[in-house]
Amino acid sequence: MPNWLEKAVFYEIYPQTFFDSNGDGIGDLPGILQKLEYLQYLGVNAVWLNPCFVSPFQDAGYDVSNFYRVAPRYGTNADLRTLFDQARRLGLRILLDLVAGHTSTEHPWFKESCKPERNHYSDWYIWTDSVWKWSAPGVQTVIGYAERDGNYVTNFFHFQPALNYGFANPDPQHPWQQPVDAPAPQAVRQELNSIVKFWLELGASGFRVDMAGSLVKNDPDGKETARLWQEIRAWLDHDYPEAAIISEWSKPAVAIPAGFHMNFLLPYGSPGFLSLFRKPSQSACSFFDPSGRGDIRAFLDEYLPLYQSTRDQGFIAIPSGNHDITPRLGNGRTPRDLELAFLFLLTMPGVPFIYYGDEIGMRSLDGLTSKEGGYGRTGARTPMQWDDSPNAGFSTAPADQLYLPVENTPERPTVAAQRAGAESLLNRVRQLIALRQAHPALYAGSAFEPVYAEAGKFPFVYKRQSGDETILVALNPASQPCEVAIDGALSMQPPEVLYGAGDAFTRVGTGWALRLPGVSGGAYRLWSK
């Protein structure tokens, strides 16, 4: 396990909308380089960079046509190497986005695979053995695409043909389903290793793996896919022990034993995560909602078994959002609401991820036309709001030439305005990041224990502990004040306020009463008894 993950706080950068350095309306790598100072100011120490490879951009770069070259709209391989080098000098590590399971239909490998004549790439993708065979359990196919007599299996959109990592349980009725140890699946695995090695040698610190559980087909329990990643992890541990990999699998109990250092909790596959910030209001409220109708047990009853089963093997990552999650965290929330959400995100175990702009409370824009396969996700991908200059400081291009429009309301949050405000959300998030990194009890692998977490009640109180240091975190997202008795956890001396609400503890008999105003919380160091 790379030691640096213990103190890691990640920041997700969507390159096309972060900062445009050349005025063409699209963000780029030199633009990110110019903004490294901001990341250092914020206090994050790691970056997840969304796909930046050559692509026709039908799915915003998740349709790769060359895994070894940076897309010209973002810059060059030399630009990316410069970014790696300069970031590392500033204490920042960069993880690339690895689309391991499929390519674009524009990839030269796939174009060769489409040919009716047998060649080196014929079996690098999954094809049925007749154009008239278009269905098989567990896969979807695109029919009649090529002169080759067969239909190809796709992972998501029709232009994302699945690479052939084999089938865990090939169906004898479908001889085109190759076992995982067949020559072509083994060749594809070797190519994946080559891609990983290429970018690690250039300076990447690891990878976020897109659709990590999708590689081996007809693998219902994920065992063969897990075996593949375990082999990669063993190789990384030997040759690149400081490299980290995180999976988009949303199944920590599968992904972490499979070799990933981290696995995301995500709305799809994790109702508990959804209950924190984005539970549909027509059924019930999220926990972080001032109405006070949320329930922390909806999260904890799912999270705790996952945490207990994986805590000695890897980390669960709880993100503030990402490019696929709508709406943004800032939608419908005040700065106080958001501060409390970040108090939670930055004091929980595992590795936190901040989606660009969430630290200033950026909002999704409704009603945007889909861009590069974004569809309903497009509004959560708009340009970073740097200042009050045209285009929010994102680009000098004419507004109608921007990759996506910026929010133009007078009250839009910006980095410049919040840097100038000592009590701004941005500076609160900075304080919380610094708090996390200054206290071993708040590191990724330090112990976690709920102290008060009753269904439908407030506050939510938990302990983090490492060695002699114990920190109590209390959260009241409801607009009404709350009070709870805390017995047995404290000494006779009141806890030290590290962050947030002061004067929260009152001595009551042999115990303590914890009182929190509405929409408030704090982190408190406990003294030894």
Model-derived features: positions:
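C-terminal beta-strand-rich structural cap/linker in extracellular carbohydrate-active enzymes
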Residues: 508-529
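Active-site groove signature of glycoside hydrolases
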Residues: 196-218, 318-322
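Loop/helix patches that line or flank the sugar-binding groove of alpha-linked glycan CAZymes
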Residues: 5-6, 239, 259, 298, ...
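Conserved alpha/beta catalytic core and glycan-binding cleft of carbohydrate-active enzymes
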Residues: 105-139, 229, 233-383, 388
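Short, solvent-exposed loop/turn segments at secondary-structure junctions
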Residues: 16-18, 53-55, 100-101, 205, ...
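Beta-strand-rich binding/interaction modules
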Residues: 481-501
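Solvent-exposed beta-strand/loop surfaces of large extracellular or lumenal domains
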Residues: 496-512
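Acidic/aromatic-lined carbohydrate-recognition and catalytic surfaces
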Residues: 2-190, 201, 212-259, 384, ...
